[in-house]
């Protein structure tokens, strides 16, 4: 029988594994620490570190550990089997390794070869850190016993058990009694029984605040699980109940999707609550320790960040706070087979945001948010602070703020990031512990106490534990710079570091209200890697994309149709069935068919080869977890007779266009009925006044993807008899609401109302709403949706690569053409399938701005916006017909000046506020500013090699306040036979979340470079243009009958691409827009004659209105309205067949200037006089979509 040592209040029973041949004496070091309820014992791998804080004497025993490889798991519900370490907190070490107390244990020694001896020791680096890593702040101090292994002693062969001698300590602490009480006394090979399973204890893994964790074998299977045995002490009962309830809530979600540990079951064992978890391999701290605390390259930090941010996104959507995020609680699932695949563990400190108590001690100190230190109200943002500290620690190899006390913690933060704002300090309940008011000043301000002052008041001596002391976070980019990179790889590393620091500063924003959210984090350029697309041939970039492969969704049998998970759409294959059938990528989550009847949507899971990103399937694909943080609350939205009750996927933008009439063609140019919904976290709905039939769509239709590069749309036009496909994109944008009945009646309280011509644009109304649940189709309402081919744009930087990889561009459109509410193009192949049902009604026109710069008008405060919804409106100012387009973005002057810090040095990309700068809209699909193959010489933005200059501090705030307006100003052309049309409605896009139009230098696609600083919201509307070449990219259109809309997408650090949408045509005479401005009062001079004489009856009627006097000489822009006629369309170059041309080439004219105040000579390189569309005599190409289903005509414009 193993000896029993009696402590002051409880017994410690020590067992030694019979497989060991020797015992060990141990000595106890007494260290002054701050006792707390949050000590962690993470013993794992070949080394274990044991912290004991109790009045009982820990006995040194070689702790057992598992073999690196785990047993195979035949259970299909487990995709992989790992071992887990659950960091714990306080409590004394009762047993480090236990064996049977009788000879029976010796007989069972054979199978115990799974257990190997490991060292129980204290890591030297922890001593350097002051041994305060996981301790909490308490006024009194106590002893901590640190176990050290000593040379082995003689084994007692008679008993078969090694007897260890332990020294005793008289040190006690005031709180050690409660911490030590309630722990379950473990015995190795003990059996824990639940209602359905039995588990045999294999070894002790760790101890936490609320219990201990053991490794167990699930009898009857070869599954290894981790069981957390909670204390039964009353002081922990309530928190244990909260943890169980949170785990129960999380168990309804896909743990693999959202990257948190999977809990299998909960049961009672001898009055102790036992939680059964999947086994994971190693925590991040042990991983760092194993690698000698060497800094982790950014290419490895990125997948860890993405996965943890995905978990935080889900927790935020559930209103949960983890409250103890740190490297010890981020587990590597299987480092050997799935490098950098991580999951979040330990929800023992978690709580619901509504139950967050101010002044509560939460989080480990190194990762404690300022609001916790200062005693401010807090929310889920504290987890984002912790994550920022974690990734900084991975980057540095050392904690960023390793405070030995809370005073040191806030001192470190203040020295690097500045003092917290005055209003935060004044509101904090614990501010006076660390700050004093300067009473001598007439305006008393807070100042940080000096270390001597704090020591005099508290007796706690301040220590310096930092390895790096930064004056600002930007200085972090200079440390640990690798020296083995050369050429473009070094540029990639520098660009990556800039984006990393930019994201880190947003995560470590002291004001929690301004701190970046998980969804915004997932859309930051550092995570989406848009800044790396400037270096397509860099092996370093390829490695970065390959490392992100681990974030892909993995489908396993755990996700069956019986699981209540939200399905996610990828590229949808065409279907000819009569009901709404959709095909999902099998790397997305499970299909959950909630259709109440056969007439509802049915969803099939298929097509596993479809890529869900803008990269080839061999490259990075997103985690479906990031694709769908699904809000749990349901909010049906009523609009007339239409009801939309969809489940929001906040990390994806879904566009749903559902006109009311499904029996026939009922839409008209003057009254377009339908719904246009852009879905996101706060999901506003785009409604249009006419009543519609109730529409319900499966949650899967509201799809979502993690790596934003466009928008995802589901287009359901009326009177379509079959669903042929749905184009999906990845983006995060807020939806906007545009009721047509309000046009001309309501006006936005923004800058446009100060202009004579601006107050009469179609008003825009936002109705933020949370779409939850699902939407089903009414009975007997089959739909037909054309497939929009999602182009894949491959970034290239050399002429040769552009020519050699043109064919790859069709599947690598980094920008993923956005197919939005009323934009569609029917391919020749697809039009035959849909022409009998509903003709195509709009064209998708793209161009490629080689230098989309952020330009702000010098209109002063006039350009500032007061709308909190952060809307962006696109203003189209046509003057006379022209095939060319230039873009002027009018940003609000609320943008902070510091955003100009990294402004590009290009002469084209002027980043100063209150100035007007030009944007070159580049026609060539071979748009690469580094070569001269294009007819227009385009200046390359300096930000291409500088992380796109998006790492300024004000970008987030700018997103919240800036309201840029985009004006499309084509050059002046005086062709009387051409008439233009202005869009019917303008759709603002909320930019609180970053859109993700990827920038690319592609061989056959647009180069959407954006020169705005820090995502200053220059919504540059560009038109994709296709240059004649051997490889043409086809865009397969989506047909719909919606009003023409402009959607300006934007996001911090990304590049925007906006589409021009062609409205359904009007058969009646041209009309003018009701602007009060004198220049807007009449129809364009060219309109009346040209509409009647110059156009065939089947050609589009084009409408226009005169530009304002200030921009009257700058040109016009065309938006085409199709008239009655063909169901198919092509814009053809003479030498190419109709099947390959689906884009409108637009040439750049010489007289395009964004403002009369800028001389043409300032932009000689942007507006070249030549045009390469020689096939078009008028240098313009128009595309129209007639409405008549009876006629099928094509008009190759030559």
Swiss-Prot record:
Region (Interaction with AXIN1): 935-1049
Stretches for region Interaction with POU4F1: 752-897
Low complexity bias locations: 820-829, 990-1045
Phenotype for residue 835 to E: Impaired nuclear localization
Entry keyword Kinase: yes
Top-rank taxon: Eukaryota
Alphabetized Gene3D superfamilies for the sequence: Phosphorylase Kinase, domain 1, Transferase(Phosphotransferase) domain 1
Chain residue ranges for the region called Interaction with HMGA1: 787-897
Chain positions with Phosphotyrosine modification: 361
Residue ranges of the motif Nuclear localization signal 2 (NLS2): 832-835
Record's comment on post-translational modification: Autophosphorylation at Tyr-361 in the activation loop activates the kinase and promotes nuclear localization. Sumoylated. When conjugated it is directed to nuclear speckles. Desumoylated by SENP1. Sumoylation on Lys-32 is promoted by the E3 SUMO-protein ligase CBX4.
Top EC group: transferase
Residues forming the catalytic site: 324
Interaction with CTBP1, as annotated region: 774-876
Note: Interesting targets for cancer therapy. HIPK2 deregulation would end up in a multifactorial response leading to tumor chemoresistance by affecting p53/TP53 activity on one hand and to angiogenesis and cell proliferation by affecting HIF1A activity on the other hand. May provide important insights in the process of tumor progression, and may also serve as the crucial point in the diagnostic and therapeutical aspects of cancer. Tumor treatment may potential be improved by zinc supplementation in combination with chemotherapy to address hypoxia.
Family: Belongs to the protein kinase superfamily. CMGC Ser/Thr protein kinase family. HIPK subfamily.
Protein name from the UniProt record: Homeodomain-interacting protein kinase 2
């Amino acid at each position: 029988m193993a000896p029993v040592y009696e402590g002051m209040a409880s017994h410690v029973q020590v067992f030694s594994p019979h497989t060991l041949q020797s015992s060990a004496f141990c000595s106890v070091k007494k260290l002054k620490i701050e006792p707390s309820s949050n000590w962690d014992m993470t013993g794992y791998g070949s080394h274990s570190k044991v912290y004991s804080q109790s009045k009982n004497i820990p006995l040194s025993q070689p702790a057992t550990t598992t073999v690196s490889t785990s047993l195979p798991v035949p259970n299909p519900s487990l995709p992989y089997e790992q071992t887990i370490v659950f960091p714990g907190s306080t409590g004394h070490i009762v047993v480090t390794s236990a064996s049977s107390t009788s000879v029976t244990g010796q007989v069972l020694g054979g199978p115990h070869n799974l257990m190997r001896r490991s060292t129980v020791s204290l890591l030297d680096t922890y001593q350097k850190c002051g041994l305060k890593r996981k301790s909490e702040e308490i006024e009194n101090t106590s002893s901590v016993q640190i176990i050290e292994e000593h040379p082995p002693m003689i084994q007692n062969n008679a008993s078969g058990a090694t007897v260890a001698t332990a020294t005793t300590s008289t040190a006690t602490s005031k709180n050690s009694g409660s911490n030590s009480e309630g722990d379950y006394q473990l015995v190795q090979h003990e059996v824990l029984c639940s209602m359905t399973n039995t588990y045999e204890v294999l070894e002790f893994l760790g101890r936490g605040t609320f219990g201990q964790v053991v490794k167990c074998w699930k009898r009857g299977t070869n599954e290894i699980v981790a069981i957390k045995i909670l204390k039964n002490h009353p002081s922990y009962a309530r928190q244990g109940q909260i943890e169980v309830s949170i785990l129960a809530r999380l168990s309804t979600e896909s743990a693999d999707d959202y990257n948190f540990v999977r809990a299998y079951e909960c049961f009672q064992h001898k009055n102790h609550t036992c939680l059964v978890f999947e086994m994971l391999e190693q925590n991040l701290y042990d991983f760092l320790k194993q690698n000698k605390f060497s800094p982790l390259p950014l290419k490895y930090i990125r997948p860890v960040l993405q996965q943890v941010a995905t978990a935080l996104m889900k927790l935020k959507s559930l209103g949960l706070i983890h409250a103890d995020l740190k490297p010890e609680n981020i587990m590597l699932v299987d480092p050997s087979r799935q490098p950098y695949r991580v999951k979040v563990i330990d929800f023992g400190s978690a709580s619901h945001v509504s139950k967050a108590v101010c002044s509560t001690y939460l989080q480990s100190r190194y990762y404690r948010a300022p609001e916790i230190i200062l005693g401010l109200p807090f929310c889920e943002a504290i987890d984002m602070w912790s994550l920022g500290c974690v990734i900084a620690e991975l980057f540095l190899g050392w904690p960023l703020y390793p405070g030995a006390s809370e005073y040191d913690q806030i001192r470190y933060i203040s020295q690097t990031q500045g003092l917290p704002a005055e209003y935060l300090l004044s509101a904090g309940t614990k501010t006076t512990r660390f700050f004093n008011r300067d009473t001598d000043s007439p305006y008393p301000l807070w100042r940080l106490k000096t270390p001597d002052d704090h020591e005099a008041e508290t007796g706690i001596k301040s220590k310096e534990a930092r390895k790096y002391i930064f004056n600002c976070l930007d200085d972090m980019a200079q440390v640990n710079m690798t020296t083995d990179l050369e050429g473009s790889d070094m540029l990639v590393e520098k660009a990556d570091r800039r984006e990393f620091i930019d994201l880190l500063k947003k995560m470590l924003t002291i004001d929690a209200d301004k701190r970046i959210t998980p969804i915004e984090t997932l859309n930051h350029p550092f995570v989406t890697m848009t800044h790396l697309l400037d270096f397509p041939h860099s092996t370093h970039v390829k490695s970065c994309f390959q490392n992100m492969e681990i974030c892909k969704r993995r489908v396993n049998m755990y996700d069956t149709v019986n699981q209540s998970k939200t399905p996610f759409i990828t590229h949808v294959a065409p279907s000819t069935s009569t009901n709404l059938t959709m095909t999902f990528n099998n790397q997305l989550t499970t299909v959950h068919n909630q259709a109440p009847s056969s007439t509802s949507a049915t969803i099939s899971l298929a097509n596993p080869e479809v890529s869900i990103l803008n990269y080839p399937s061999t490259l990075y694909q997103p985690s479906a977890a990031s694709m769908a943080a699904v809000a749990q609350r349901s909010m049906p939205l009523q609009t007339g007779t239409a009801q939309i009750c969809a489940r929001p996927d906040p990390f994806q933008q879904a566009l749903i266009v559902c006109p009311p009439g499904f029996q026939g063609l009922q839409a008209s140019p003057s009254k377009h009925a339908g719904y246009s919904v852009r879905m996101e976290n706060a999901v506003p709905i785009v409604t249009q006044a006419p009543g519609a039939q109730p529409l319900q769509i499966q949650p899967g239709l509201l799809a979502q993807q993690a790596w934003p590069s466009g928008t995802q749309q589901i287009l359901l036009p009326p009177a379509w008899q079959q669903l042929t496909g749905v184009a999906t994109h990845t983006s995060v944008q807020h939806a906007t609401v545009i009721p047509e009945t309000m046009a001309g009646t309501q006006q936005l309280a923004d800058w446009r109302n100060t202009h004579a011509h601006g107050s009469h644009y179609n008003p825009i109304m936002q109705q933020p709403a949370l779409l939850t649940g699902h939407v089903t189709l009414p009975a007997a309402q089959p739909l037909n949706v054309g497939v929009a081919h999602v182009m894949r744009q491959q970034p290239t930087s050399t002429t040769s690569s552009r020519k050699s990889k043109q064919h790859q561009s069709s599947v690598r459109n980094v920008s993923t053409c956005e197919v939005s509410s009323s934009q569609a193009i029917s391919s020749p192949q697809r039009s035959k399938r849909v022409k009998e049902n509903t003709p195509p009604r709009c064209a998708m026109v793209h161009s490629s701005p080689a230098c989309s710069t952020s330009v702000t008008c010098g209109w002063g405060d006039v350009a500032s916006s007061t709308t909190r919804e952060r809307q962006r409106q696109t203003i189209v100012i046509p003057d006379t017909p022209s095939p060319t387009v230039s873009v002027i973005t009018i940003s609000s002057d609320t943008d902070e000046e510091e955003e100009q810090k990294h402004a590009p040095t290009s002469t084209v990309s002027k980043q100063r506020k209150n100035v007007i700068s030009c944007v070159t809209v580049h026609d060539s699909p071979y748009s690469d500013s580094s070569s001269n193959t294009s007819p227009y010489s385009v200046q390359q933005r300096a930000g291409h090699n500088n992380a796109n200059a998006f790492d300024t501090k004000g970008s987030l705030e700018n997103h919240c306040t800036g309201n840029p307006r985009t004006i499309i100003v084509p050059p002046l052309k005086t062709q009387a036979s051409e008439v233009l049309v202005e869009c019917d409605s303008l759709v603002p896009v909320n930019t609180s979340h970053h859109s993700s139009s990827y920038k690319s230098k592609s061989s056959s696609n647009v180069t959407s470079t954006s020169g705005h600083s820090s995502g200053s919201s220059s919504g540059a509307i560009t038109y994709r243009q296709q240059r004649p070449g051997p490889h043409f990219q086809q865009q397969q259109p989506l047909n719909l009958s919606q009003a023409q809309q402009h959607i300006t997408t934007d996001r911090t650090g990304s590049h925007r691409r906006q589409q021009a949408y062609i409205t359904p045509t009007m058969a009646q005479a041209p009309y003018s827009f009701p602007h009060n401005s004198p220049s807007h009062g009449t129809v364009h001079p060219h309109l009346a004659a040209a509409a009647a004489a110059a156009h065939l009856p089947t050609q589009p009627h084009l409408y226009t209105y005169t530009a304002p006097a200030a921009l009257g000489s700058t040109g016009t822009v065309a938006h085409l309205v199709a008239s009655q006629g063909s169901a198919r369309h092509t814009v053809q170059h003479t030498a190419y067949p109709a099947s390959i041309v689906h884009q409108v080439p637009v040439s750049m004219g010489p007289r395009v200037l964004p403002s009369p105040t800028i001389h043409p000579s300032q932009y000689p390189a942007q507006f070249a006089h030549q045009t390469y569309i020689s096939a078009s005599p008028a240098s313009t190409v128009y595309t129209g979509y007639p409405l008549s289903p009876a006629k099928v005509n094509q008009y190759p414009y030559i």
